[in-house]
């Protein structure tokens, strides 16, 4: 279940650090967060879709690793990002 191109482009434009940035940690985490939201909604309807559940757990793990990397290298940017995304209460 991939993101639509226009949705992905909008996320990139919102979270990019500079004009040509498409793959910074911030952008990657924002894209993964959107995919997690979509998969969570899918799994609310399709409770027995275990393949998607496994994919969701894999995506959550990838986002967790990226957030840990960002926290180690730039804690201030990490804090700003999680506030903007509304994750981790």
Swiss-Prot record:
One of its GO terms (cellular component) is cytosolic small ribosomal subunit. One of its GO terms (biological process) is translation. This is Small ribosomal subunit protein uS15. Keywords: Ribonucleoprotein, Ribosomal protein, RNA-binding, rRNA-binding. It comes from Thermosynechococcus vestitus (strain NIES-2133 / IAM M-273 / BP-1). PANTHER family: RIBOSOMAL PROTEIN S15, BACTERIAL AND ORGANELLAR, SMALL RIBOSOMAL SUBUNIT PROTEIN US15M. It comes from the Bacteria. One of the primary rRNA binding proteins, it binds directly to 16S rRNA where it helps nucleate assembly of the platform of the 30S subunit by binding and bridging several RNA helices of the 16S rRNA. Forms an intersubunit bridge (bridge B4) with the 23S rRNA of the 50S subunit in the ribosome. Part of the 30S ribosomal subunit. Forms a bridge to the 50S subunit in the 70S ribosome, contacting the 23S rRNA.
């Amino acid at each position: 279940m991939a993101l639509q191109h226009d949705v992905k482009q909008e996320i990139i434009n919102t979270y990019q650090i500079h004009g040509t940035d498409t793959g910074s940690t911030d952008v990657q985490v924002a894209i993964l967060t959107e995919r997690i939201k979509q998969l969570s909604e899918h799994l609310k309807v399709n409770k027995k879709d275990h393949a998607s559940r496994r994919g969701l757990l894999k995506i959550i793990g990838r986002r967790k690793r990226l957030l840990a990397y960002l926290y180690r290298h730039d804690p201030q940017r990490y804090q700003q990002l999680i506030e903007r995304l509304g994750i981790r209460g």
